[in-house]
From Swiss-Prot:
The lineage of its organism: Viruses, Duplodnaviria, Heunggongvirae, Uroviricota, Caudoviricetes. To phage P2 protein L. It comes from the Viruses. This is Probable head completion/stabilization protein. GO terms for biological process: viral capsid assembly. It holds the Pfam family Phage_GPL.
């Protein structure tokens, strides 16, 4: 689209709390097909909000690992895919899904492409949030669903 804006990905790295992986804005934009028409500051804000939420949800997991002398997610022993272990991959999945869910309403307002005009954003947001929840539950060692007796 010719709108006078450059169509480059952002190379910003969002530094995390020390345990969980840093987040690369460019990786999020590419992996989740974020339209480049969405202002990068909006993308960064969505990522920061998602990181904070996921970090809060996983605080007990990080603390448990630290008590076991694992001070970074990269130290968790497991098979690697593209130099990432399962915990790094699931963490990014949760963060990216939450951030995209937050950005979805902007797709229609900021992108004039027909592909975004007939999307069911509510269903897509619910699906993304469910994806994030599943990744978080997996990192916590929980199954897809749980029932408690009160």
């Amino acid at each position: 689209m010719f709108n006078g804006r450059t169509q480059d990905y952002d190379d910003t790295v969002i530094t995390n709390n020390g345990f969980w992986s840093d987040i690369y804005v460019e990786e999020f934009q590419k992996q989740r097909a974020i339209p480049l028409q969405i202002p990068v500051e909006m993308v960064k804000a969505a990522l920061v909000a998602a990181i904070q939420g996921v970090d809060l949800d996983l605080a007990d997991v990080a603390e448990s690992y630290r008590k076991s002398a694992v001070n970074s997610v990269t130290e968790i022993s497991s098979p690697l895919i593209n130099d990432e272990n399962y915990a790094e991959t699931l963490y990014k999945k949760a963060v990216f899904a939450r951030a995209k869910a937050e950005l979805l309403p902007e797709f229609n307002t900021l992108s004039g492409r027909e592909i975004h005009q007939n999307r069911d954003y509510v269903t897509e947001q619910k699906s993304l949030l469910a994806e994030a929840t599943h990744a978080i539950r997996t990192l916590k060692g929980k199954k897809r669903g749980s029932v408690w007796l009160l």
